[in-house]
Amino acid sequence: PGFTDWAMDVFPALLEGDVPFYSHEIDAYWDDIGNVDELRQSNFDALRGAVEVEPGAPEVSEGVRAAVPLDGVEVEAPALIGAEVELGEGVRIQGPAILGDGCRVGRGAWIRDSILLAGAELPAGTFLVGGIAGRLPESSES
C-alpha cells in the first residue's frame, strides 16, 4: 500500500532479487507523464510537432488549427481548437493552447499556455494561464 515509484522501488527490487526483466528501445517520442505539468508539456509537444499525431482540425493560419470559425477572437500559435467549440466575442487564446471538442469560452476570456479538456466551460472574463480545465461531473443525488 502507498506510493510506488518504478525507478526507485520496483527496478531496484527486481535487480536485488535477481529477477529477470527486459527493456525495449524505441526511436519514438516518450514522456512518462506523472503529473499535470508533464501532461500539459506532452500535449504541447504534440501541438508543436514533436509527436506524429493527427491534428483533427485544419490549419487556418500558421500554427493554428481550428475546427470552428475564429471570428471575433484573437489566436496566437501554436493552438488547436476542436469541433463544436463556442468562443465568445473578444476571447484571446495565446499558445500553446488546446481547446478540446465542445468547450465553451465566455466573452473576453483569456487562455494562455493552457488546455481545456473536452466539454470544459470557461466563464466570461476568466484568465486561465498555465492550467488544465475540465468539465465537472454531473452530481448524483442519493
Predicted region positions:
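A generic, residue-level signal for flexible/boundary positions that often mark functional hotspots
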Residues: 15, 20, 27, 75, ...
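A structural motif detector for beta-strand N-caps
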Residues: 57-73, 79, 85-91, 97, ...
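Alpha-helix N-cap/loop-to-helix boundary motif
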Residues: 31-34, 77, 95
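Extended, intrinsically disordered, low-complexity segments
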Residues: 138-142
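Catalytic-core segments of class I nucleotidyltransferases/pyrophosphorylases
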Residues: 1-54
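Histidine- and/or cysteine-centered catalytic micro-motif in compact active-site loops
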Residues: 26-27, 44-45, 84, 90, ...
